[in-house]
Amino acid sequence: MRRLGWLLLVGGLAPAFAQDESAGPPEKPHPAMMAPLAAKRTLIGISEVGSKLIAVGDRGHILSSADGKDWQQVPSPADVMLNRVRFRDDKTGFALGHDATILATRDGGASWTVAHFDATSRTLYDLAFLDDQHLIAIGGYGTFLDSADGGATWAPRDFPIGALGQHFSAVTKLADGSLLVAGEKGLLMRSKDQGANWELLDSPYTGSFFGVLPHGDKGAIVFGLRGNVFVADDVSKCPTLKVDGYDPYAREPILDPAKIAALGWRVVATPTRESLFGGARSDAGAVLVGVNGTVVKLDAAATAASTPRAPDGDTLADVIFRNGHWLAVGRRGATDLGAL
């Protein structure tokens, strides 16, 4: 399933206009409309840059805030749904979303330009910086884009795992420098050489993952459908699978904790069955957010989970830790979760 398909259901989203199919797909996106209530509409991604916050979401909206309470809309050159925003430093960042849209900023989010757009291509869900010049973007149905010039231009890359057609939902760089991608039907793939080559991991789960966080020196936390959370303390020790002949739809669920441990993972029992879409870490642990306003807190060792806040019914998509507070974004804009 698509990582953000839930938004089409809970948000009641519809196209801003009907397009004449005979005209073919547009060659460039339409600019997003400046909307007085943009801060109250669906926001899906949030990131900190310098002393401010940038959030992105429905209809290409990009918003900026100094305190997480008062938000101002920033002109956006694309009116497509934006799923994620990432910054390399205090100046350079990227927002990405539907129609393989990638927007770039070189001034800390004050202004944005179109770096990539293809109305015939798939939705993009996440992005990672490999170094100052090399970036990757991932998305639906195995979509994988490379940039070797700091994000100025992007090119698709085909490789065996991508050919499986599973959605790539999230990517992160672990503390040891390796990369981990999580996605549909339990997909986990790892790169030890800055994204040049990828290995398919033998996954402990057959449902979809929507997020991944670094954990410790070599580990990771992956989370997703129905509140499932798995932790590996050393991803480099997780066994791999051959891609040739692999069928993700033929896998049987693994219920035995010993078999899950043999794959290098352990289950974190969470007090929810709601799907979890976004997460962030602090020194005290991690916070994951999801359907119906669900908030799950993990301790620093990622061994125990709790729900420090009652769900309020409004789905949350992403969260960030800043100045001692957790700030989430979702169906009704930004929500201050407090210190938790």
Short names for language-model regions:
Residues 1-4:
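Positively charged n-region of N-terminal signal peptides that target proteins for export
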Residues 17-340:
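Residue-level hotspots at or immediately adjacent to binding/recognition sites across diverse folds
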Residues 10-18:
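Hydrophobic h-region of N-terminal signal peptides that target proteins for export
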